[in-house]
Each structure stands twice: as structure tokens, then as C-alpha cells.
Curated annotation (Swiss-Prot):
SUPFAM superfamilies: Globin-like (SSF46458)
GO annotation (BP), single: photosynthesis
RNA-binding listed as a keyword: no
GN (gene name): apcF
Positions of post-translational N4-methylasparagine modification: 74
Full protein name: Allophycocyanin subunit beta-18
Modification note: Contains one covalently linked bilin chromophore.
NCBIfam families recorded: apcB (TIGR01337)
Gene3D superfamilies documented for this protein: Phycocyanins
PANTHER family: ALLOPHYCOCYANIN BETA CHAIN, PHYCOBILISOME 32.1 KDA LINKER POLYPEPTIDE, PHYCOCYANIN-ASSOCIATED, ROD 2-RELATED
CC per GO annotation: chloroplast thylakoid membrane; phycobilisome
Length: 170
């Protein structure tokens, strides 16, 4: 699946229905462009601070859930710890794509598809992943507190991922 944004989704919907864009579609497209500077400002801060955000989120996660890094924990051993950091990077990177696109579909197709089953089969506690996503969300909000309405665009991808991971599980 290709990456999509709000505009592609709007146009695809109208194209599939064989309709011209109506005032609702035009309003939504205008909103996408009107909020672009905010969304791009957020992503610029994420990009500039990604290593620090990942480091802070992982430290806070392991502080809250020390069993993850103890023997037999899911992040115990260098290989598992590195895999955990890699996964944190994936969540952060794809959340930033979602923020720019103003669309969560990239999260379903690129991050969440099969991930829940993989984590369940490996015994990775989904509650820890949800905690991690909450930590990432709050760290980004803190770093973007000077951007008006940043929280609206930061909440959406992280809450979406948490919801999908929690469905019928945690």
C-alpha cells in the first residue's frame, strides 16, 4: 500500500463515487493546507530530536517496567534491547509520517498490520507497548509546546496505535 494523505483519501472517495468535489470536500482540503505549517513544525522538531526522544522514552519505559530488562524480560540481552529501540524508532518515524499526511492509514498498513500478532506470539506485553506510545506522545508534546494546537496532531497517531493494539487484548 502506498502512503496516502488526507487529500488523496478525499479525492479517491469522490472519484470512486463518480462525484465532483462538494463544499465539504473543499473545506477538508482547505483545512489540510491551513494546518500544514503546524504539522510540518511538529515533524521538524521530531526529526531534530528523534534520538533524544527514543532515548528518553526507552529510559522511562524501563524505569516503569524494569522486568523488561531483567533476565527473561523481553528487552533482556543486547539483541532484544536493540530490537526494542528499533521498534521505538519505527513507531516514532511512522507517527511523524502520519502527522504530515494528516492520515492514520500509514500506521495500519506499515506498522500495525501483523504487529499485534507478532508481539503476542513472542510474548511481548502489549501493555508495555501502549505505555511506550503514551511516553512518546507526551515527550513530543513537551518538545512542541510552543506550537499552537500541536497536541491535536500529536494525539491522533499515537491514540490510534494504542486503540488498535488494545482491541480485545490489554
Amino acid at each position: 500500500m502506498q502512503l496516502q494523505d488526507s487529500i488523496v483519501n478525499i479525492i479517491s472517495t469522490y472519484d470512486n463515487a463518480g462525484k465532483y468535489l462538494d463544499s465539504n470536500a473543499i473545506t477538508n482540503i482547505k483545512k489540510y493546507f491551513d494546518t500544514a505549517d503546524t504539522r510540518l513544525g511538529i515533524v521538524k522538531i521530531i526529526n531534530a530530536n528523534s534520538s533524544l526522544i527514543i532515548q528518553q522514552a526507552s529510559s522511562q519505559l524501563f524505569e516503569r517496567n524494569p522486568e523488561l530488562i531483567r533476565p527473561s524480560g523481553n528487552a533482556y540481552t543486547t539483541r532484544r534491547y536493540a530490537a526494542c529501540l528499533r521498534d521505538i524508532d519505527y513507531y516514532l518515524r511512522y507517527a511523524s509520517y502520519s502527522i504530515v499526511a494528516n492520515d492514520t492509514s500509514v500506521l495500519s498498513s506499515r506498522v500495525l498490520a501483523g504487529l499485534k500478532d507478532t508481539y503476542n506470539s513472542l510474548g511481548v506485553p502489549l501493555a508495555s507497548i501502549v505505555t511506550l506510545l503514551e511516553l512518546l506522545k507526551e515527550l513530543i508534546k513537551e518538545k512542541t509546546k510552543n506550537i499552537n494546537d500541536a497536541h491535536k496532531y500529536i494525539d491522533e497517531p499515537f491514540l490510534y496505535m494504542m486503540k488498535i493494539l488494545c482491541e480485545n487484548d490489554v
